[in-house]
Amino acid sequence: AEQLVIDYSEKSVIVQKEKLIAKNTDENLKLIFTDGVQQKEINQFISKSQAFVAGLMHDIGGVYPNHQRVEKAELFGIELLTEEREFPLIIHQKLSKYLAREHFKITDENILSAIECHTTLKENFTELDLIVFLADKISWDGGDNAPFKEGLLTALSVNLQSAALYYIDFIINDGLKVAHPWLLEAKKDLENQLS
């Protein structure tokens, strides 16, 4: 995979934005409103532009390889959980929020929240959080051969919460490497909402 180096000079940020648009638009953003997560399911408080921006920015923290993520998070003053230190891949969601806010000047707290929890979801999630979380799973890096995709799409035909709970149960039963506390809290919230 292409590694991006960002020095955050004005020119580098422009290049980064162009690469993000080229890399993510087709792969991820259109999926927010396809494959079952349809516009009709998004209430009037969430705009397509919020979902678009969150979808565009959600993985920018991935510019830092796993072996640099703890160091970068500490440098940026990002609080890390034990589970994130143990499995640095997860840190990219917090780095993405930081970069979106500090370097791309995103100020909408709803967008920043969705970026920050797109991998794990979290307790008291918003509808935008849930949509970006699901779009991220539908557009899984492994392509269409995601082992959970068919079941997730079936659950999505019921509602967003059912799809999210299906995915979380699937990865836990499949031997999740690290159980992030936010994921477990989101699971409880989903179970309560669906009971």
Swiss-Prot record:
PROSITE patterns: HD (PS51831). It holds the Pfam family HD. InterPro entries: Diverse_Catalytic_Enzymes, HD/PDEase_dom, HD_domain. Residues 24-141 form the HD domain. It comes from the Bacteria. This is Uncharacterized protein in pepC 5'region. It comes from Lactococcus lactis subsp. cremoris (Streptococcus cremoris). The lineage of its organism: Bacteria, Bacillati, Bacillota, Bacilli, Lactobacillales.
